[in-house]
A protein has these predicted regions:
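Acidic, glycine/proline-rich low-complexity segments that act as flexible tails and inter-domain linkers
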Residues: 1-50, 103-118
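Non-catalytic, well-ordered alpha-helical scaffold segments
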Residues: 16, 51-55, 86
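Residues at alpha-helix boundaries and short interhelical turns
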Residues: 23, 44, 62-65, 79, ...
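Amphipathic alpha-helical segments within well-ordered protein domains
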Residues: 37-38, 55, 72-76, 89-90, ...
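Amphipathic, charged-and-aliphatic alpha-helical interface segments
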Residues: 51-65
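Mid-chain, well-packed structural core segment of small domains
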Residues: 61-89
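C-terminal structural segments of small proteins and small subunits
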Residues: 86-109
Length: 118
C-alpha cells in the first residue's frame, strides 16, 4: 500500500475503494487529490477537530450516512467530544432540517454512543 494510502487508513480507518482505483487508473489525479486531502485536514486557522465537526455536519446535511460514520470515526480518533458533535448536528438541523439531524444523531449513537465523556 502506498504511503499516502497508509496515512489515509490511519486517519479514517480504511482506504475507500475509489482511492485505490484512482491510484491505478489516474495516478496524477490521485496524487493531487491526496495532496489536497492533506492540505485541507492540516491544522490551520481551524483545528483538525473543528474541521471534522464541520465535515460531519455537511455529511449529515447531505444525508450521507457512510460519510457521517467515516468522519465520526475520524473525529473520535482526534478526541472530539460527543457534545461537540451534537452542537455541529444542531447547526445542520437548523440549516438542513430534521432529516439531516436524524442521520447524524443515529451515527453519533452508533459510533460514539458508549464512549465516556471527557
Amino acid at each position: 500500500m502506498a504511503e499516502k494510502q497508509k496515512r489515509l487508513e490511519e486517519k479514517i480507518g480504511k482506504v475507500p475503494e475509489i482511492f485505490k482505483e484512482l491510484e491505478k487508473t489516474d495516478p496524477d489525479l490521485y496524487g493531487k487529490v491526496m495532496g489536497l486531502d492533506q492540505m485541507i485536514w492540516a491544522d490551520g486557522a481551524l483545528s483538525k477537530q473543528t474541521k471534522k465537526i464541520i465535515a460531519i455536519a455537511i455529511a449529515a446535511a447531505l444525508r450521507d450516512g457512510h460519510a457521517v460514520r467515516a468522519q465520526m470515526a475520524g473525529a473520535g480518533e482526534l478526541g472530539v467530544k460527543k457534545e461537540e458533535i451534537e452542537e455541529g448536528l444542531r447547526v445542520a438541523f437548523l440549516l438542513a432540517g430534521m432529516p439531516a439531524y436524524v442521520c447524524g444523531k443515529a451515527a453519533l449513537e452508533e459510533i460514539l454512543g458508549d464512549r465516556p465523556r471527557r
